[in-house]
UniProtKB/Swiss-Prot annotation:
Family: Belongs to the auxin efflux carrier (TC 2.A.69.2) family.
Gene: PILS2
Transmembrane segments: 16-36, 55-75, 86-106, 117-137, 152-172, 292-312, 323-343, 357-377, 394-414, 425-445
Provenance organism: Arabidopsis thaliana
Name of the protein in question: Protein PIN-LIKES 2
Single GO cellular component term: endoplasmic reticulum membrane
GO biological process: auxin-activated signaling pathway; endoplasmic reticulum to cytosol auxin transport; intracellular auxin homeostasis; lateral root formation; regulation of growth rate; response to auxin
Length: 457
């Protein structure tokens, strides 16, 4: 009996260590970045971290995605992996519902209602997820077997294009400044100038460019205005003076005498406004280097003739993929160093309120993972998950358990809405996530690996 009980204790200790050790490795990298960028030491200036984030965005991450996803993907895998992008959509929908409950319970300031929903709904399904998977797979006791890292990175990369589309369409418009708040500020021109100076200040938080370098170059005429609210607010108005910023005839339809202008005038009022909003949606930003790398990997990997030329030990272009693989290996340490630099700035002052901050963090880091367990396990029992790989289910579960996406801070800055609140909330979420992720990774190991073993038996 004593031997049996000691064996159980040892097994539990191994399970706990298997979940703690990967995060400890990531914490070490983050602490190094924090010490290097801390204002008291300033061993590495903030500008260096901005350059490092640009390298991650434009080079390291695309190289990692292309080499790992391209080598793993096949036409059969695309069919088997269909639940990965669907799971991203499910996590966003369920997160939005939970975020709405947070609004009802915590009652944030009215101008932050949409912000609360967005920060609860959209998690970091990109860089942080890749870092967690890589750290787990570089542990000797990892339960996922050989080729763990390649499979995990492929699953995460296959989901990124869905998350990017959601951010640059749905999230972009949900994060526009509230109409009522904007009109109050608009009455006092001095206040507008102060807000614009703050948004364009060179001392903006590092998180603004942590996952979207060069964001200041992406600003458009209407990006910091309540564009959609004003467009559709003018539907019930017979006068165009209530919406002076958007030239529905001249700007989008050309000269008044042109055929296109005549066609636009014949459009229904609602359809014309939908078209204007669609033209103001930054769809072109979807084709960023990581997304392009994902598309190229899927295309090349799905065509056997192309894949045999690019991937494999005997491939004629294997020297190129080997070089890209070397550069891609720098992604995880670079991302964690940038995260440490972001955390070194500390939390900004926030008017969101302590109750709402705690509510969003609890909902995102504790409640949503529990709901995710129910969704993924139910999908597995219903036969919707065709892959028997435990890493597949592990990635699906992780998509529900990460902090809010750092990219949301960049969108907040681009829209001029809740920039300080996003910075403060992301700071505290990443601090609390150290505990929540440790707890849930241990649970996910048991659910994925033990369930798979029992199913084989």
């Amino acid at each position: 009996m004593s031997g049996f009980s000691s064996g159980n204790v040892n097994s539990r200790v191994v399970d706990i260590l298997s979940g703690v050790v990967p995060l400890l490795k990531l914490i070490c990298l983050t602490v190094i970045g924090l010490l290097l960028a801390h204002p008291k030491t300033q061993l590495v200036p903030r500008a260096t971290f901005r350059l490092l984030s640009k390298l991650v965005f434009a080079l390291f991450l695309p190289c990692l995605i292309f080499t790992e996803l391209g080598e793993s993907i096949t036409l059969d895998n695309i069919v088997q992996w269909w639940f990965i992008p669907v799971n991203v959509l499910l996590s966003a929908v369920v997160g939005s519902l939970i975020g709405y409950l947070v609004v009802l319970i915590c009652r944030p300031p009215p101008e932050f209602n949409r912000f609360t929903i967005v920060m609860t709904a959209f998690g970091n399904t990109g860089n942080l997820l890749l870092a967690i998977v890589s750290s787990v797979c570089h542990t000797k006791t990892n339960p996922f077997g050989p080729n763990c890292n390649s499979r995990g990175v492929s699953y995460v990369s296959f989901a990124q294009w869905v998350a990017v589309i959601l951010v640059y369409t749905v999230v972009y418009h949900m994060m526009e400044p509230p109409l009522e708040y904007y009109e109050v500020v608009e009455e006092e021109g001095v206040e507008i100038e102060e807000i614009n100076v703050e948004n364009h200040d060179a001392s903006r938080p590092l998180l603004v460019e942590a996952e979207w370098p060069g964001i200041e170059d992406k600003e458009t005429e209407h990006c910091k205005t309540p564009f959609i609210a004003r467009v559709f607010n003018s539907i019930s108005s017979f006068s165009q003076t209530s919406f002076p910023e958007v030239d529905l005839g001249g700007e989008y339809g050309g000269e008044s005498s042109s055929p296109r202008s005549i066609q636009c005038l014949a459009e229904p009022r609602v359809m014309r406004r939908i078209r204007v909003v669609a033209e103001q949606t930054p769809v072109k930003h979807i084709l960023q280097p990581p997304t392009i790398a994902s598309l190229l990997a899927i295309i090349i990997g799905s065509v056997p003739q192309l894949k045999s030329v690019v991937f494999g030990y005997d491939a004629p272009l294997s020297f190129i993929t080997d070089s890209l693989n070397i550069m891609g290996s720098a992604m995880v340490p670079s991302v964690m160093l940038v995260l440490g630099g972001m955390l070194s700035e500390g939390p900004n002052e926030s008017t969101l309120g302590l109750r709402t901050t705690i509510g969003i963090s609890v909902a995102r880091l504790l409640v949503l993972p529990l709901v995710g367990i129910g969704i993924v396990m139910s999908a597995d029992k219903l036969g919707l998950i065709s892959s028997a790989d435990p890493m597949f289910k592990f990635v699906l579960l992780l998509q529900y358990s990460t902090p809010s996406a750092i990219l949301l801070g960049a969108i907040a800055s681009l829209r001029g809405y809740a920039v300080r609140e996003a910075s403060a909330l992301l700071f505290w979420q990443h601090i609390f996530a150290l505990l929540s992720l440790t707890f849930y990774i241990v649970i996910f190991f048991k659910l994925t690996v033990e369930t798979t073993v029992q199913g084989m038996q």
